């Protein structure tokens, strides 16, 4: 034990650690006193001593024990007292990292499970499927065996075929044991003590048995492996193959060759002179206080530092770091809290004497292990780095070139099992030597069969080639056989002319009907007659060579047949431009149908069109075409039965070089735009399908460009850019009869992530479910006929309803017209007849004027003036209607009325005007001015009877006007009258009094009238009392 964890060879590592702690001022304010007890790796003794330390000495922490059984007893007891235990040395049992049992344990030792995981990872990395574990009677090697058996039993890749324990470590016994293993394995994992020359003896035994050839690999592993170095009695670091005893055996070179067949798993140590100086200082400081080990430590066995002295150093330093962290974060009162000390160690990392120390949060060191070997010059180098956490290993090759790793093996990785087996007797039989006659017979048969197969293959290939040529003739469209369709009809026939001549012919024998519709020809599309049938042509601006695989694709396209896929006719390659030809569909494309807006597309109509597109796309995706790649509304054609047929598919050799049009880019998926894919994808087709659907449900072009502020290139840029909220067409303005599930499907189909879009099979399934409950029309044609029948029946009702509305509106317009013109005149104008001026022999004309109107106007606002006149004349108009009179016009406050025209009424006109004048005078008695209640309205009235001429003047706002001296005389009667009086001319007086005796009149006498001279005039005072 002295060579591993002996007190005489390791205790001073504590003082060396304390010197470092003090120099770094980690715990300046805390004094640490050490109590040394010796358990001698005895489990009972260790339990008793630790009990006294915990109960009597009230220690803050226990460092040790260094053996597994004793250590487990102590950590079990310390857990009860919540006192931290820091283990080191030989305590490699994996039980120490079980925090459920031992929550106060901190171990700096790489446990056996970690070493076993590293060994297992080596086997996996180099593809060794089985190996043998060789170990001596040593506690740590036993733990390795147990954990290695557990890990390999759970592994699906490598297995532990055998474990061999060596009890006698003599050279003779090593030879005997290895000779047994020679026929068992070629990959060996070896666990031997680090001290002494046991490793050298083991490898020399293998060398002597010829077990150090390129077939053998020996993997040494241990928590404290010194790799390929050892410290001699003089303190020098020499190779592990060197015999530095007093009587060397002289086999150092043979031992070196043997060690070139080994690999070692080692912790990352402090390299070189620093580590050697530490080990030397450990021995020297044991002679100094507080140890004063002078006489005892002179013994030869105590002249080299213990194997695990560096771990004791790192344990003390780690404890100081944890204390420092605990005090800074929680205070000094927590430094004896065992479970808390464990968690405080999380994240601590430092360069110790045992290598890089990294701690996790459960008191367990995460070992950094290296895999090392010797190169062809016997120089140690690191092959790989391993970061280990319990059973998981993060492997990184330090040397990438496998040949360089195995340069000592001539650059070849040793195999798990040799080609000839472990015994060397299982080499493959040389079949050609042992069975030559069978080989000859079989060879002859094979030659004959090959000749027959070659002849048959030739015939099959020739027949297939002839068939391919025949099928090629079907898709090749000679340019000379095309006829161009000329727009317009002549005598109910379409005319066309050959592309190769100037002669004009009539295509009365072709398949073009008198009702065929051909849409405008563009740079990419045209219409022709081929084989007496109209065809649709797609033009290509580039010419590309057509290879064998392209011809195969064209033959395949000719075989495509589906109700919703437009038939491919062929390809013309001998004209000015390449043109592909497709079956002509009389109703054009979906884009054309939407643009014409002549079809009433309801929800079911749109559903049927979309279902046809989805069905055709599903066929394409499951056909050898795989994807469409450039689906737009322009390549979805509709035949005369309103069936959608998808065209412009396939021709991948043209798609790869043809530049997409602007309309095509508006239908292209964002990932296709970003990645520049020319052939497209199935997910991209589903996106294009959704854009076409948005056109149908929105009754608009793609993205509704006509009503958007963005240009097409801006939309393409925003779609290509993507983002958290992708830019997509609006589905807000759709008809109410569109199924909401259809809108959800469209949004799913244009999802930014292609993986989130439904495939076309799912789309068709969802489309079918949308119509599962519909009764009535089963297809679009039935639906169209049903709609036409309903439309015809409702059209009759609508016509009758419109006629009623028209009659009502006519009545309203007639009433308005009759108020503007006399009815007789208006009727003639409505009939389009001219209204000639007409002379009337006897009429009576009435003029009136508001007295003092200017004064009233000055007292009123313009709006009040208008309201005053409107109220006054509304009162007058009601009186006029009762007296067979016609109001000619009102000019300001002047009022002109006539009776006796345009309907002649004999001599009643004078009585009508007289009665009307009297009623007007009476109505003024009760008339009030709303804004001038104290004011009274008075008028002057003038009347005159005589002849006049009437006629319509003007075209815009025509007026029925009176002409003649009678009009002027009536006006003079009004202007020369008095307020509140009715002024009559002598002619009017004579006519009135001669015919009607009931009126009360009075002579005014002679009055000078302007333009007339002296005239005898009269006042109309009212009705006689007996008449009233």
UniProtKB/Swiss-Prot annotation:
List of glycosylated residues: 58, 156, 324, 337, 377, 394
Topological domain ranges for the Cytoplasmic compartment: 459-1028
Coiled coil: 786-817
GO biological process: cGMP biosynthetic process; intracellular signal transduction; receptor guanylyl cyclase signaling pathway
Alphabetical list of PANTHER family matching this protein: GUANYLYL CYCLASE, RECEPTOR-TYPE GUANYLATE CYCLASE GCY-13
Classification lineage: Eukaryota, Metazoa, Ecdysozoa, Nematoda, Chromadorea
GO molecular function: ATP binding; GTP binding; guanylate cyclase activity; peptide receptor activity; protein kinase activity
Enzyme class, broadest EC rank: lyase
GO CC terms, sorted: plasma membrane
Bilayer topology: Single-pass type I membrane protein
EC number(s) reported in the record: 4.6.1.2
Positions of transmembrane segments: 438-458
Region (Disordered): 491-511
Domain-related comment: The protein kinase domain is predicted to be catalytically inactive.
One Pfam family matching this protein: ANF_receptor
Gene: gcy-13
PROSITE patterns in alphabetical order: GUANYLATE_CYCLASE_1 (PS00452), GUANYLATE_CYCLASE_2 (PS50125), PROTEIN_KINASE_DOM (PS50011)
Alphabetic keyword roster: Cell membrane, cGMP biosynthesis, Coiled coil, Glycoprotein, GTP-binding, Lyase, Membrane, Nucleotide-binding, Receptor, Signal, Transmembrane, Transmembrane helix
Biological role: Guanylate cyclase involved in the production of the second messenger cGMP.
Similarity annotation: Belongs to the adenylyl cyclase class-4/guanylyl cyclase family.
Major localisation: membrane
Biased composition (Low complexity): 497-511
Recorded superkingdom: Eukaryota
Descriptive protein name: Receptor-type guanylate cyclase gcy-13
Reaction(s) catalysed (UniProt annotation): GTP = 3',5'-cyclic GMP + diphosphate
